[in-house]
Regions:
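Helix-loop-helix junctions that connect adjacent transmembrane segments
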Residues: 178-192, 231-274
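Membrane-embedded helical hairpins/re-entrant loop segments and their flanking transmembrane helices
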Residues: 35-44, 48-51, 55-56, 60-89, ...
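Alpha-helical transmembrane segments of multi-pass membrane transport proteins
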Residues: 25-36, 52-54, 108, 120-121, ...
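Membrane-embedded alpha-helical modules
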Residues: 32, 43, 91-93, 113-239, ...
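Short hydrophobic alpha-helical membrane-embedded segments
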Residues: 50-57, 76-80, 100-105, 193-200, ...
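Hydrophobic alpha-helical segments within and immediately flanking transmembrane helices
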Residues: 60, 77-89, 104-116, 345-348
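Intrinsically disordered, low-complexity non-transmembrane regions of multi-pass membrane transporters
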Residues: 1-44, 242-249, 427-454
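Membrane-interfacial helix-loop connectors
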Residues: 67-69, 105-118, 287-291, 333-334, ...
C-alpha cells in the first residue's frame, strides 16, 4: 500500500484536465467531465474488468474473512453490498473512479480481536457504531487531520505487524494434510509431499505475479486456483469448507454487555473507524496515481460510501469495508475506466455468495499462497518508510512488533505514546520550549498542515 499522501483534489471530483494534442501549448485545457458510475464508451472494458477482478476477489475475500474469524459467506456478502453501495454513490459523490471496495486484509486482525473480546453476536453493534463515528468524521471532514495526527509511517508499521500475523496464520495451510494421512511422525511422506506442492504453487504464483503485475495481475490468481482445482481432482489435499450460514436482517443491538464492556467497545470502534479511514485515504492516494485518465480522488466522498456500506452491513452481521489497493490495481490493469466495473464485481461475488458449494473446490494450499503473499506485501510496505528517515523506520518497526506481540489496539497506542514522548522531550529539552508551548505548536501545525490534505 502506498504511504504517500494524495494531492489536493479539484473542487469538482468529476473533472479531468486533459490537454488537446492539436491545441496550442499556451491554450488552457478544457475540463473533460464524465460520469464516474457509467460511460457507454467504456462499458465493454468495465464489464471485462469487473469479471476478472470479481473472480480474483473471491479467494482474497475468503482468506480475509477467515483471518477475521467471520463466516466466509458473510465476508462475501459484505464485499457484494459494498460494491453496490460504491457504484450507487459514484452517481452522486464519487470518491474515485476505479477503486474496488471490499473487506480489507489490514483490518482482519482488528475484527478478529473484536470477535474474541465481544463475541460475534456483538460485532454487528460494533460495526454500526464504527459507521456512526465515520459518518461524524465524514460530516466534519476530519479525515484530512488523521494522516497528520497519526503519521503515515506508524500506519505502515501497524500494517506490517498485521501482515506478519496473516503470513503466519495462513502458512499453516501450506503443510496441512488430510486427517486420514496424519501419523505419529509429524514429517511423514504425506506432509513432505504437501510442503513440496505448496512451495511449487507459491513459487509459480510469485513468478507469474512478477511477470504480469504491470499488465494482468489477475493471471497468477487464476493460474493458482485453476491448477489447485485440477490437482485436487487427482490427489487428496485439504479443501476449503464454506459453511452456508443464513443471513439474517436485524437491528444491530448489543447483547449481554456490562458497562466496562461497553466502554471498551466504544474505544475499540473508535480505533477501527480511524484505521479504516486512514487506509482509505492512503488507498485513494495510490488509486489516483494509477487512474487511466488521471482523474482526482476525493477522500471525503469515498468515506461517505464507506460509512453507508458499513452501516448497511451491520444489519446482516457484515464486516467493515474500504477500497482495497490489490483489487483496485487489478481492476485498472484489467481495463476499468468507471465504477460500472464495481457493479459487475458485486454481481460476480453475489453469485458465489449465493452458490457457496462452488467454493468447496478451492484447496487450502492455494489460499495459503495467496494470503502469505498478501502478508508479505504488507510487511514490504515498510520500504516506503525509509523515505522518512531512520527515526520513522525505527518507530514503524517498533509499532509493527508491538502490534504483532501485544495486539492492534495496545500496540498502536503504545507506539503513538512513544512518538509523542520523543517529540515532547526534543522540544522541551533540546529547544527549551515550555510544555504548554509545545502542545500549542502541535495543534497550530495540525490546523495549518490539514489545509494541504483533501
Amino acid at each position: 500500500m502506498s504511504s504517500e499522501t494524495e494531492d489536493k483534489p479539484s473542487v469538482n471530483g468529476n473533472e479531468e484536465n486533459k490537454a488537446s494534442s492539436s491545441a496550442p501549448a499556451s491554450q488552457v485545457a478544457e475540463p473533460v467531465t464524465g460520469s464516474a458510475a457509467f460511460q457507454a464508451k467504456y462499458a465493454g472494458r468495465d464489464i471485462a474488468a469487473g469479471l476478472i477482478t470479481g473472480a480474483m476477489a473471491i479467494p482474497l475475500s475468503i482468506g480475509i474473512a477467515m483471518m477475521s474469524d467471520y463466516p466466509i459467506k458473510v465476508g462475501l456478502a459484505t464485499v457484494a453490498f459494498a460494491s453496490f453501495v460504491g457504484w450507487i454513490n459514484a452517481w452522486f459523490r464519487p470518491g474515485n473512479y476505479i477503486g474496488s471496495p471490499g473487506i480489507a486484509a489490514g483490518l482482519a486482525p482488528v475484527l478478529a480481536l473484536g470477535v474474541a473480546n465481544f463475541g460475534i453476536q456483538n460485532m454487528a453493534f460494533c460495526i454500526c457504531l464504527t459507521a456512526i463515528m465515520q459518518a461524524i468524521i465524514w460530516h466534519l471532514n476530519w479525515q484530512r487531520y488523521l494522516l497528520i495526527a497519526v503519521p503515515v509511517y506508524l500506519v505502515e508499521g501497524l500494517l506490517a505487524g498485521v501482515g506478519l500475523k496473516i503470513l503466519l496464520r495462513f502458512f499453516e495451510f501450506a503443510y496441512e494434510i488430510p486427517a486420514e494421512s496424519v501419523t505419529e511422525e509429524f514429517w511423514n511422506d504425506a506432509r513432505i509431499q504437501m510442503c513440496a506442492i505448496s512451495a511449487i504453487g507459491f513459487a509459480g504464483f510469485v513468478y507469474l505475479f512478477s511477470k504480469f503485475r504491470d499488465t494482468q495481475p489477475a493471471v497468477p490468481y487464476f493460474a493458482l486456483i485453476i491448477g489447485g482445482v485440477i490437482l485436487a481432482q487427482v490427489m487428496t489435499v485439504p479443501m476449503i469448507y464454506v459453511e452456508d450460514v443464513p443471513l439474517h436482517f436485524r437491528l444491530p443491538l448489543p447483547e449481554d454487555f456490562t458497562t466496562m464492556l461497553m466502554i471498551y467497545m466504544v474505544l475499540y470502534c473508535l480505533m477501527l473507524a480511524i484505521i479504516d479511514v486512514i487506509e482509505q485515504v492512503m488507498s485513494n492516494a495510490a488509486i489516483e496515481k494509477i487512474d487511466p485518465l488521471k482523474r482526482k480522488c476525493n477522500s471525503n466522498n469515498s468515506l461517505l460510501a464507506i460509512w453507508i456500506a458499513n452501516l448497511g452491513s451491520s444489519f446482516f452481521g457484515g464486516m467493515t469495508n474500504l477500497d482495497g489497493l490489490a483489487k483496485s490495481t487489478t481492476n485498472k490493469l484489467a481495463g476499468a475506466y468507471t465504477k460500472f466495473s464495481v457493479l459487475i464485481i458485486g454481481c460476480v461475488v453475489t453469485f458465489f455468495m449465493l452458490n457457496t458449494e462452488y467454493l468447496d473446490y478451492l484447496p487450502k494450499f492455494a489460499l495459503a499462497a495467496i494470503m502469505v503473499f498478501t502478508g508479505y506485501k504488507m510487511i514490504a510496505g515498510l520500504v516506503h518508510v525509509t523515505h522518512y528517515g531512520p527515526y520513522a523506520l525505527m518507530l514503524a518497526l517498533i509499532c509493527g512488533g508491538l502490534v504483532y506481540k501485544v495486539g492492534i489496539f495496545e500496540g498502536l497506542l503504545i507506539a503513538m505514546a512513544i512518538h509523542a514522548i520523543v517529540h515532547f522531550m526534543v522540544y522541551t529539552k533540546h529547544d527549551n520550549m515550555p510544555g504548554r508551548a509545545v502542545i500549542k505548536r502541535y495543534f497550530d501545525n495540525l490546523k495549518k498542515d490539514s489545509s494541504s490534505v483533501s
